[in-house]
Regions:
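Short, flexible active-site loops
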Residues: 134-144, 267-272
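Short secondary-structure junctions
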Residues: 39-46, 108, 161-169, 294-305, ...
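Hydrophobic/anchoring residues in structured secondary elements
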Residues: 119, 172, 307-310
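Class II aminoacyl-tRNA synthetase-like tRNA-binding/catalytic domains
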Residues: 1-130, 136, 141-142, 194-208, ...
Length: 372
């Protein structure tokens, strides 16, 4: 199993959690506050528990205690950042729920709304709405006073959307999660495209039982993406802007007023021809993670990464095979990298240095075609 190095762990933990007021003010916190206020008004007799845990969590709370199968693909190191055999950087804020449920089981409380916000760590694609360090919010109402089911879930969904995105058209579609029954995905309409903002469901009885809550307890579970909600609320079309240090942008990340675009930096495109093994995982998530790791502190300069084409060894011209020194079973990928920092313009020389870093991270062949 691949485990993070000490340097990689320190780098991950050093990244600012935009949901944490102790690390500075950010509009993401206003989204959380507005949801908390709306649900508190809807459920005046429900206790509110706000939880903020360290991002290094037990593997069991990230997966097992939420009902994930032992062979679930999401457990693999290509998707999860392992700190040790038994600890991970949480891949979702749902990892805070099992300890909260255990605390509830040991308490005298009978109706609680658990609010868990924080940064998460994933391996994800590079595009305008994805990042490897998203911010998520888990909202779980657990009660033995009232029976919570699908009607209450529908009401909770409506209150969430009406609070953060008033007037927005939305829909729900069936979704499967190991920690819910009657699972749903929540989408909102942006222009002519449905954009996912979160998932939810009725809390799965087996998850409650694992925490020591008997069958008198029922619950609702919801996990909206905070970055996505804020971007839709403010009209932001680039997730990297949420962390921008450009004063013209950063000043607008303190409220929920519509975003006013600043002058756009020109994109720099570089097409890469790389060789990969037949067994290589070339999914957008895995390639995106390799790009971010390769660029390090310059990772936010990558606006997008797209595989334009794939050619097998057998389908390549002999001249191309010889030039790349490919062997049977390997593949040639044509990858387009778009570089565009949100706060400055790259020179050609700077772009070429970044291009070569990405090339080295993706290319598995013996011949290096570097620019610098």
């Amino acid at each position: 199993m691949s485990v993070l190095t000490v340097e990689e762990l320190h780098s991950a933990l050093a990244l600012r959690d935009l949901t944490d007021p102790a690390q500075g003010t950010h509009a993401v916190q206003l989204v959380v506050d507005s949801i908390r206020t709306a649900l508190a008004a809807a459920w005046p007799y429900t206790e509110i528990w706000t939880r903020r845990d360290h991002p290094v969590v037990p593997l069991a709370d990230n997966y097992d205690n939420l009902g994930y199968a032992t062979d679930a693909v999401t457990r693999e190191a290509r998707y999860t950042r392992y700190v040790s055999d038994n600890e991970v950087l949480r891949s979702h804020t749902s990892a805070m729920i099992p300890p909260a449920l255990r605390e509830l089981a040991a308490s005298e409380s009978s109706d609680v709304l658990m609010i868990c916000a924080g940064i998460c760590y994933r391996r994800d694609s590079v595009d305008w709405q994805h990042t490897g360090t998203p911010h998520q919010l888990d909202l779980w109402r657990i009660s033995r006073n009232v029976t919570l089911g699908e009607p209450e879930l529908e009401d909770m969904i409506a209150r969430l959307v009406d609070t953060v995105l008033p007037g927005q058209v939305y829909r729900t579609v069936p979704a499967v999660h190991p920690y819910t029954i009657h699972g749903r995905q929540i989408d909102v309409l942006l222009d002519d495209q449905w954009i996912e903002i979160g998932e939810c469901g009725v809390a799965a009885p087996h998850v409650l039982r694992l925490a020591g809550l008997d069958d008198s307890w029922t619950g609702l579970a919801m996990g909206p993406g905070l970055d996505r909600l804020m971007m839709l609320r403010k009209g932001i079309r680039d997730i990297r802007l949420l962390r921008s240090t450009d004063p013209r942008v950063a000043g607008q990340m303190l409220d929920l007023a519509p975003y006013k675009a600043v002058s756009s930096m020109p994109p720099v495109r570089r097409d890469l021809s790389v060789v990969v093994d037949a067994s290589a995982d070339v999914s957008a998530e895995v390639l995106g993670d390799k790009v971010r790791a390769a660029l390090g502190p310059d990772a936010d300069a990558a606006e997008s990464l797209e595989v334009l084409g794939e050619t097998s060894y057998d389908d390549l011209p002999t001249s191309a095979r010889e030039r790349l020194q490919m062997t049977p079973g390997q593949r040639n990928l044509l990858v387009r990298l778009v570089l565009r920092p949100v706060d400055r313009t790259l020179t050609d020389a700077e772009a070429n240095v970044l291009r070569d870093k990405v090339y080295r991270a993706l290319h598995e062949g013996p011949v290096l075609e570097l620019i610098v």
